[in-house]
């Protein structure tokens, strides 16, 4: 889907993601469930 440097997340976007690091689902933030 969407990957690289944050994906859907990006600073608390879609589902309260931390942004940066991971891509679409999981990972170091971004996508679903980030660092806060």
UniProtKB/Swiss-Prot annotation:
Tell me the keywords, alphabetical order: Antimicrobial, Fungicide
What is any one GO biological process for this UniProt entry? defense response to fungus
Where is the segment annotated Disordered? 1-36
Does the keyword field hold DNA-binding? no
Entry keyword annotation includes Amino-acid biosynthesis:
no
Role of this protein: Possesses antifungal activity against a number of phytopathogenic fungi, including H.sativum and F.culmorum.
Report the protein name in the record.
Answer: Glycine-rich protein GWK
The organism is: Cucumis melo
